[in-house]
Amino acid sequence: MRVIAELPHPDFKISIFSMNQKFIVKIERGILEQSYKISEMDITDGVNSVFELLDEEFLATVTARFKEMGSDFKSAYNRYN
């Protein structure tokens, strides 16, 4: 797996990898991460098409999902302690 690109974002780290004819978009925020696999066959303009997928609407959804994930993890952690 090799790093193709890292995109700046104020709230999280976005990395794009290439592995086995797939692009893997990894988005990290603190201890949490989300990853998305996209077949190279499904997009027409290589990594540039991946950049286009990462629009503001998608990133807003990612932000909301991180909040949900954090809440879920905190609840599980509190049940443990």
Describe the function of each predicted region.
Residues 43-81:
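Mixed-charge, Lys/Arg-enriched low-complexity segments
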Residues 2-37:
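N-terminal acidic leader/helix
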Residues 38-42:
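Short Gly/aromatic-enriched secondary-structure transition segments
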